[in-house]
Amino acid sequence: MDQDAFILKEDSEVEREAPGGRESLSDVIGFLDAVLSSEPTDIGGDRSWLHNTINTPQGPGSAHRAKSEGEGEVSTPSTQDNRSGEESRVSGRTSKPEAEAHAGNLDKQNIHRAFGGRTGTNSVSQDLGDGGDSGILENPPNERGYPRSGIEDENREMAAHPDKRGEDQAEGLPEEVRGGTSLPDEGEGGASNNGRSMEPGSSHSARVTGVLVIPSPELEEAVLRRNKRRPTNSGSKPLTPATVPGTRSPPLNRYNSTGSPPGKPPSTQDEHINSGDTPAVRVKDRKPPIGTRSVSDCPANGRPIHPGLETDSTKKGA
């Protein structure tokens, strides 16, 4: 402390001038022990006793007493300033708890007013959850007369009549989301969910979703016939005869599947038959046996010849 340092400095100067400095030093040490052993709560009390002169025996220590009295008068303004600063610090320390207590009282008053305006004097115990009713009405009356929204009225109606939802489901009516805004109906081109789903309506047409159809046997056969027309190997050429542009193939006779005109024997060369329903297959006609002649299916007169009437030219002379 500054005062202790001032006293030590004073004592050192006294020891230099007075021969009985040892006695004064012992007195100072005893004084310091008394100061250090004092309780810290006495700091804000009266400290005027610190500035009193130390009574020393008469004789050589008279100069010490005179000098201490003179210097004590000079140093009184500084000690008064220190005392005022310490008192202000102590008052500041004591004012902090008082300010905190005052703020706490204000908070308690505000809480009491807030809860007292709603539920009464016992609102704090009710809102803290004492196991009883909180005092808040589930369906408060419309005291101010403000118009309620349709969603709120609908929710209250559903709460009052819980069987209405079951009746809607039994009648097949769409059940809308209670308390939510219904999604816009996009008409024929969009998905009209009428609030049954929270997903946004798709922009594509709903008719496109019916493309997948269960295949019928006729459809499967048509697909198989179409696949048979295509060549199995990409490198192989189809076996159909090449057609020259500008020429027309002769029409097939309904009596002759080989395409040869009536009255002529069938061709012995290889021919290709490619119908619309069967794949291209090479068919090779066999030559007629020796001694027989081919007879057309239908001669010029339109009467078929019985096979038993044919005669062998090798057995009978012509």
Swiss-Prot record:
Compositional bias (Polar residues): 50-59, 191-206
PTM annotation (Phosphoserine): residues: 68, 125, 192, 249, 257, 260
Region (Disordered): 1-23, 38-318
Residue ranges with Basic and acidic residues bias: 7-20, 83-101, 150-168
Coiled-coil boundaries: none
Membrane-spanning ranges: none
RNA-binding is among the record's keywords: no
Keywords: Phosphoprotein
Comment field (misc): The P/V/C gene has two overlapping open reading frames. One encodes the P/V/W proteins and the other the C/Y proteins.
Protein name, entry field: Protein W
Species: Sendai virus (strain Fushimi) (SeV)
Upper lineage: Viruses, Riboviria, Orthornavirae, Negarnaviricota, Haploviricotina
